[in-house]
């Protein structure tokens, strides 16, 4: 007889059954499909449109050429090329306005303000008990006002204390200065050329804005947001109520929505065709995890405007280096920022409501109204979700209460119907002391143990990388991700398979989802508390995660209604046990299966025929057409508890997998797919987005002296969050995928431990400055970076050969600063007859006049071939005043901690600043004596410090030979960036007695 005929119940292949092959294939396909979509969103920039498909009024070819011209050289505020860029921008603006005004009559009025009058004295506000830094700055901003159709028709800014009537306008800002070591293609050239295209777009016929639009080309952002601060002194700062800030903190890719002030203004970003960003970045600023700032903090914090911050965020290794140029970016990135700017600005200038024009509680700020905190994130870079944080809080509280309640009610219903197999060890037979084992506790603690072990292993790998090769994530973030994810899946699969081998359980899924439900419930509680008390919305993904987990868990509980009643199962099992016991005595006389009559089953039990052909009774199966007895069994030990399985038999009950509980044969075999689709896609999308955003933004923070362990720890924890939805099914996986992932893990682990962390495409940033002491003629070149790579770089510099570099702790974290004597700079052109010693150089002119009998002095400072100087004091001064400067109580220039440094910026070259300073008497330290007499506390009325001037122009070779040398001889994997506002700082010491 053929095998098929011998076993008429051979199962047919079910492509959606909860069996190894379908589970392995379907889960792999789902995870790969969604992960690939998430990766494509982050790695592929949407292509720029052709000229024919571009919006009317936008010329992308022209924008790219403008970017190439703008980035033709370094143009920091303190450089001659910065003046050239300023003049070029005025020319381009005038050309665009002239072209459109001549082309049609129905175009808006345009007013161009070349602001060479505004100035301001202010400070950094102080940190803790530290003295503050004071700043004096003179504006060279260019402000373009496009009058809206509903704007005040009068030129109100021409009147003394004139104020606009009607609704507030919209500000779009970008800064046209670069750092001294970067060409500024993305920081902030793309923002600047986007402003030029916005000017072109809104000045053609048919595109006239309803509300006035102000385009601010600000100068001086890189040196402490100076351009935005001095904009506060211009009349237009009182007109605008909303803003869009265009920035660059990377060197390409997609422009990310960095942060926003409120929900209402964020909704205009939904107009973008390719939105990109998450509220997670904005909360990073709130929590202080992101230290750098943009003009956003001035527009919102000082002026009270409501708006958005859009910025490039990667790769950080090119930020502020010579690779921030047009060659290392592309027109697609330019189009992404420009398209976002057009869509958002068009929405803002077309808005007819009054949300941004109501009174505010702070009288020092514009009447832009009060917004609500928001939650926002993109989906595959094609859709954008935005809603109020209060809404998230309300939904979270509702779900935190209702989800456990629903599961509790479902559990009660299961208990009432005698189908609550969860947490059930056995079932007593009515009227007897005999119990039947249900094995319902199998797998109860499997999930927390295995998930804890896998997470601990990934965290251990994070520690290992931090100790052995801490900066590998700088260039190989995907190798780190691959290592973490592959080891997580393999370890989880291996442990789950071992547990399933020794203690198989049909309740594995239900217990797994229950534990995940508990864990995510706790996470949502924490997230909800932070949202309510601190306004932190970064945990938004936990709400959706928990909601999906709840639904998947509920499905597992609802599945249990398909099981037989526990009492019925125990009764049927007991009958089977008695039949088997009665047959043991005659087993030797029992004929073989081939000798049995056709109505006798292969296990010695009579075939009762089709149950559909009999009248139903109390013992009839709830699911007709299914067997109601459990003929395959095993007798337990001497405990009096009996348990029945198919052990020792070749024919298994239909629906039972392996050696799982025999009562599980009626469980649906397809609901696992529903659970997978309910949970996995939303988790991959949201957690994958969070993970990529974190590692993309933070993978290269090591070069700034920040510990990279936080990046590895994030990868480890997010791996658990990302693949926890897979765990309820992972014990069904075949060995093929986990074995392949084990090989991936071994390969990536070896690579991550031994590979060199930097490359020409992902360079290590090292920071340069040269300091010259004009009193004794000495100079020192200083490089700041991380060890041992800093030493490797210095060893490659010819001028450092034969010298012992003096290394000290750097300004932050693990940074180290090393100095040596280098070739002298030539930032000031000397008379041909002058010798080349440093002493006679007259780079800085200064004069100090002390007021008799008072701790007051007037300091006049001027530097040759520069427009940036500063005063540093050994002891902070109490107050200072700059001749001819404006002050603004919104931007205080002093504090109780005193002022340790005063930075001076001028729009004119070789300007003379006049600074008046006041200082307190400084008590002599114990043990000191002013005149060598008896030790006593006397006052020292002197003030000492340095007069320093800065040079930042690096466009001509040979002006700063030390910088040229470092760039020429540093390894290819090193990028040179500025260490301070100036590349060269020259100083004189002074003492005022």
UniProtKB/Swiss-Prot annotation:
The active site is at residue 221. Pfam families: Peptidase_M28, PFF1_C, PFF1_TM. One of its GO terms (biological process) is proteolysis. Its EC number is 3.4.-.-. Its main location: membrane. Zn(2+) 2 binds at residues 187, 222, 320. Residues 1-24, 413-447, 497-509, 556-672, 731-737 are cytoplasmic. Residues 579-621 are annotated as: Disordered. Keywords: Glycoprotein, Hydrolase, Membrane, Metal-binding, Metalloprotease, Protease, Transmembrane, Transmembrane helix, Vacuole, Zinc. It is found in: Vacuole membrane. Zn(2+) 1 binds at residues 175, 187, 247. Glycans are attached at residues 59, 116, 119, 238, 806, 847, 955. GO terms for molecular function: metal ion binding; metalloexopeptidase activity. May be involved in vacuolar sorting and osmoregulation. This is Vacuolar membrane protease. It comes from Paracoccidioides lutzii (strain ATCC MYA-826 / Pb01) (Paracoccidioides brasiliensis). The lineage of its organism: Eukaryota, Fungi, Dikarya, Ascomycota, Pezizomycotina.
């Amino acid at each position: 007889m053929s095998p098929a005929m011998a076993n008429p119940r051979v199962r047919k292949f079910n492509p959606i059954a909860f069996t190894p092959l379908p589970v392995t294939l379907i889960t792999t396909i789902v995870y790969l499909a969604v992960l690939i979509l998430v990766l494509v969103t982050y790695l592929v920039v949407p292509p720029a449109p052709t000229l024919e498909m571009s919006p009317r009024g936008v010329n992308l070819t022209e924008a790219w050429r403008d970017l190439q011209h703008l980035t033709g050289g370094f143009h920091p505020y303190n450089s001659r090329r910065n003046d050239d860029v300023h003049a070029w921008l005025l020319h381009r603006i005038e050309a665009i306005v002239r072209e459109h005004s001549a082309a049609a009559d129905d175009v808006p009025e345009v007013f161009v303000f070349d602001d060479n009058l505004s100035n301001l004295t202010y400070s950094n506000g102080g940190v803790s008990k530290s003295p503050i830094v004071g700043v004096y700055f003179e504006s060279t901003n260019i402000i373009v006002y496009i009058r809206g159709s509903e704007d005040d028709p009068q030129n109100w800014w021409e009147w003394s204390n004139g104020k606009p009537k009607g609704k507030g306008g919209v500000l779009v800002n970008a800064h046209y200065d670069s750092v001294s070591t970067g060409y500024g293609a993305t920081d902030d050239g793309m923002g600047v050329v986007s402003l030029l295209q916005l000017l072109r777009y809104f000045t053609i016929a048919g595109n006239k804005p309803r509300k006035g639009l102000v385009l601010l080309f600000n100068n001086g952002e890189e040196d402490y947001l100076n351009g935005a601060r001095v904009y506060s002194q211009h009349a237009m700062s009182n007109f605008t109520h909303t803003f869009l800030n265009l920035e660059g903190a990377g060197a390409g890719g997609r422009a990310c929505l960095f942060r926003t002030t409120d929900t209402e203004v964020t909704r205009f970003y939904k107009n973008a065709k390719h939105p990109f960003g998450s509220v997670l970045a904005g909360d990073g600023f709130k929590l202080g995890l992101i230290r750098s700032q943009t003009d956003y903090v001035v527009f919102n914090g000082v002026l009270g405007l409501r708006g958005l911050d859009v910025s490039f965020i990667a790769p950080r290794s090119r930020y502020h280096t010579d690779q921030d140029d047009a060659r290392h970016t592309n027109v697609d990135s330019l189009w992404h920022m420009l398209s976002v700017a057009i869509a958002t600005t068009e929405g803002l200038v077309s808005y007819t409501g009054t949300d941004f024009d109501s009174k505010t509680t702070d009288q020092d700020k514009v009447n832009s109204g009060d917004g609500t905190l928001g939650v926002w994130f993109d989906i595959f870079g094609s859709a954008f979700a935005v809603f109020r944080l209060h809404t998230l809080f309300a939904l979270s509280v509702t779900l935190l209460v209702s989800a456990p309640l629903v599961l509790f009610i479902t559990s009660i219903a299961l208990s009432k119907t005698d189908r609550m197999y969860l947490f059930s060890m056995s079932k007593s037979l009515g009227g007897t002391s005999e119990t039947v084992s249900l094995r319902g506790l199998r797998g109860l603690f499997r999930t927390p143990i295995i998930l804890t072990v896998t997470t601990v292993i990934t965290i251990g790998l994070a520690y290992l990388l931090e100790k052995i090769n801490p900066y590998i994530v700088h260039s190989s973030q995907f190798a780190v991700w691959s290592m973490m994810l592959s080891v997580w899946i393999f370890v989880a699969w291996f442990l789950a398979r071992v547990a399933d081998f020794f203690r198989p359980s049909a309740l594995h899924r239900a217990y797994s989802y229950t534990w995940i439900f508990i864990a995510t419930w706790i996470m949502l509680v924490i997230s909800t508390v932070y949202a309510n008390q601190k306004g932190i919305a970064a945990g938004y993904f936990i709400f959706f995660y928990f909601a999906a987990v709840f639904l998947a868990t509920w499905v597992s509980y609802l599945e249990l209604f398909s099981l037989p009643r526990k009492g019925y199962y125990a009764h049927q099992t007991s009958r089977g046990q008695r039949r088997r016991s009665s047959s043991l005595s005659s087993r030797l006389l029992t004929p073989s299966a081939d000798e049995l009559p056709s109505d006798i089953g292969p296990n010695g039990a009579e075939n009762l025929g089709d149950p559909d052909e009999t009248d139903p009774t109390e013992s009839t199966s709830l699911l007709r057409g299914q067997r109601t007895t459990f003929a395959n069994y095993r007798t337990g030990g001497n405990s009096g508890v009996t348990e029945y399985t198919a052990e020792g038999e070749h024919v298994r009950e239909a629906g039972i997998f392996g050696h799982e509980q025999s009562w599980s044969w009626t469980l649906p075999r397809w609901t696992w797919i529903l659970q997978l689709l309910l949970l996995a896609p939303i988790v991959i999308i949201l957690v994958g987005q969070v993970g990529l955003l974190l590692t993309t933004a933070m993978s290269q923070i090591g070069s700034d002296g920040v510990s990279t362990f936080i990046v590895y720890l994030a990868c480890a924890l997010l791996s658990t969050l990302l693949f926890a939805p897979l765990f309820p099914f992972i014990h069904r996986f075949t060995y093929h995928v986990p074995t392949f992932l084990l090989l991936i893990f071994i390969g990536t682990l070896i690579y991550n431990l031994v590979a060199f962390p930097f490359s020409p495409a992902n360079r290590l940033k090292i920071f340069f400055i040269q300091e010259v002491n004009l009193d004794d003629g000495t100079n020192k070149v200083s490089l700041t970076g991380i060890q041992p790579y800093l030493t490797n770089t210095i060893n490659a510099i010819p001028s450092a050969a034969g010298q012992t570099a003096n290394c000290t702790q750097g300004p932050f974290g693990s940074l180290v600063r090393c100095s040596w004597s280098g070739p002298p700079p030539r930032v000031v052109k000397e008379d041909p007859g002058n010798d080349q010693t440093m002493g006679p150089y007259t780079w800085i002119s200064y004069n100090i006049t002390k007021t008799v009998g008072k701790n007051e002095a007037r300091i006049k400072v001027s530097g040759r071939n520069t427009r940036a100087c500063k005063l540093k004091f050994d002891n902070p001064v109490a107050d200072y005043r700059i001749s001819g400067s404006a002050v603004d109580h919104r931007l205080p220039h002093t504090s109780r901690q005193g002022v340790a440094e005063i930075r001076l910026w001028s729009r004119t070259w070789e300007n003379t600043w006049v600074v008046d300073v006041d200082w307190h008497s400084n008590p002599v330290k114990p043990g000191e004596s002013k005149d060598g007499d008896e030790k006593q506390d006397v006052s020292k009325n002197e003030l000492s410090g340095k007069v320093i001037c800065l040079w930042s122009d690096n466009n001509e070779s040979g002006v700063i030979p030390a910088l040229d040398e470092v760039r020429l001889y540093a390894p290819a994997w090193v990028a040179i960036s500025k260490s301070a506002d100036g590349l060269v700082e020259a100083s004189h010491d002074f003492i005022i007695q």
